[in-house]
Design a protein with these regions (language model features):
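A residue-level marker of the well-folded mature domains of exported/periplasmic proteins
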Residues: 1-197
Length: 197
């Protein structure tokens, strides 16, 4: 399963089907579940978040150099899904990347309390733009925030997929995850009859 919100269901299935291996992305309950067929996995997304923050910081510097904003108004907005460790570590990495390029930058975070709500993500982005954020990033799963950014002409950094089709004039980059190495490793372990790491 590839979403945080699926973990309780995967735990139930793992208990019901002990001869099947279950792997759940982004969760945290496998180790304490007592189920030998339940596994959690994640990637080093903080690295991609940091690099996308560097890109955002470079864009802020460009906007400062062009006179569109000042160092004092280099404010970034971040649309987060939930105030969970995964989201907080993600926006922290992103902001460290931003500040590596634009030390005067500040950041405001708003949460949707949903992993995927186009309307809430769009509303959060619009609210951040109204709060004078000049660049928006996200840890949420729809194109809501980039849609708001494109309409307002505000640069944005996406998540999971390229947002260029949604925001062709404002999307800078997206932090994305390559799950393939884990899937290959877990599948090979099942085929070989070895433990899944």
């Amino acid at each position: 399963a590839n979403s945080f919100g699926h973990e309780s269901y995967i735990l139930q299935a793992a208990a019901e089907f002990p001869n099947v291996q279950f792997c759940h992305a982004t969760g945290y309950q496998a180790a304490g579940s007592g189920l030998s067929n339940m596994h959690n996995y994640f990637t080093s997304i903080y690295e991609s978040r940091y690099v996308s923050g560097v890109v955002a910081g470079m864009k802020l510097n460009e906007m400062i150099a062009d006179g569109k904003i000042t160092e004092d108004t280099a404010k970034v907005g971040y649309v987060g899904a939930y105030p969970y460790a995964e989201v907080i570590s993600g926006f922290t990495s992103f902001f460290l990347g931003v500040r590596s390029q634009c030390p005067s930058a500040t950041m405001e975070v708003k949460y949707t309390n949903s992993w995927a709500s186009f309307d809430l993500e769009k509303e959060c982005a619009e609210s951040l733009i109204a709060d004078k954020c000049v660049l928006i990033s996200q840890h949420a799963d729809t194109t809501g925030a980039p849609t708001a950014c494109e309409a307002a002409g505000v640069p944005c950094v996406g998540y999971n997929i390229s947002m260029i089709p949604t925001a062709p004039n404002t999307a800078l980059t997206s932090a994305s995850i390559n799950w393939e190495p884990y899937y290959e490793s877990a599948t090979k372990s099942v085929i070989d009859g070895t433990a899944i790491d």
